[in-house]
């Protein structure tokens, strides 16, 4: 009985991982589907059109970082359906941004 307990503890200690891998998950800024394109835009006209929309200059880590990237160039962070010729059709706020 004592041998079983000691053997089980020893086996449990050996089975424990020595190093844990850091897990990274993709950042979800814009919902999948239609509004999947993150853009920085000057003006959001009632969620229908975003004027002077450009792609972020770097890959955002999260929603606040996305907002900061766009704010550096004087624009607003938005998710768009179809960015064409610096205009984006159907825009909304990214997930996690309140203003």
UniProtKB/Swiss-Prot annotation:
Induction: Shows the highest expression in the down of developed fruiting body (DFU) and low expression in the other stages of fruiting body development. Transmembrane segments: none annotated. The keyword Secreted applies. Residues 1-15 form the signal peptide. Disulfide bonds join 30-79, 40-70. It comes from the Eukaryota. Its main location: secreted. Keywords: Cell wall, Conidiation, Disulfide bond, Secreted, Signal, Sporulation. Homotetramer. Further self-assembles to form highly ordered films at water-air interfaces through intermolecular interactions. Belongs to the cerato-ulmin hydrophobin family. This is Class II hydrophobin 2. It comes from Cordyceps militaris. The lineage of its organism: Eukaryota, Fungi, Dikarya, Ascomycota, Pezizomycotina.
């Amino acid at each position: 009985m004592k041998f079983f307990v000691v053997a089980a503890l020893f086996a449990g200690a050996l089975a424990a991982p020595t190093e844990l891998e850091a897990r990274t998950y993709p950042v979800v800024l814009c919902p999948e589907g239609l509004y999947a394109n993150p853009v920085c835009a000057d003006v959001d006209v009632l969620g229908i059109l975003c004027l002077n929309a450009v792609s972020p200059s770097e890959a955002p880590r999260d929603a606040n970082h996305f907002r900061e990237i766009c704010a550096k160039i004087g624009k607003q962070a938005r998710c768009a359906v179809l960015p064409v010729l610096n205009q984006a059709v159907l825009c909304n706020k990214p997930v996690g941004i309140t203003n």
